[in-house]
């Protein structure tokens, strides 16, 4: 499952998603949810990746940021 799918399925705003994973800015969370081909897309660093795995209870994993 992608982070965007998790966000949408749980009806979270980007601000709520950022807070859930410990990011200080909703813009960062928004960039994590963009298609990987988008010029502004970002992949979370190790710290946030761990937070994302924990916050989503394993529904979003690192490989989900790399698949098409």
Describe the predicted segments one by one:
Residues 13, 24-28, 45:
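Short coil turns linking two alpha-helices in DNA-binding domains
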Residues 4-7, 30-31, 46:
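Basic side chains
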Residues 36-55:
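Short, basic-rich loop-to-helix N-cap that marks the start of a DNA-contacting helix
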Residues 1-21, 50, 54, 59-63:
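A short, Lys/Arg-rich alpha-helix, primarily the initiator
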Residues 17-18, 28-32:
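Conserved hydrophobic/aromatic packing and binding residues within compact polymer-binding modules
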Residues 23, 34-35:
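Alpha-helical DNA-recognition elements
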């Amino acid at each position: 499952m992608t982070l965007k799918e998790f966000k949408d399925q749980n009806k979270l705003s980007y601000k709520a998603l950022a807070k859930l994973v410990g990011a200080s800015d909703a813009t960062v969370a928004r960039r994590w949810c963009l298609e990987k081909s988008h010029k502004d897309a970002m992949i979370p660093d190790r710290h946030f990746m761990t937070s994302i795995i924990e916050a989503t209870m394993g529904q979003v994993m690192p490989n989900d940021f790399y698949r098409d």
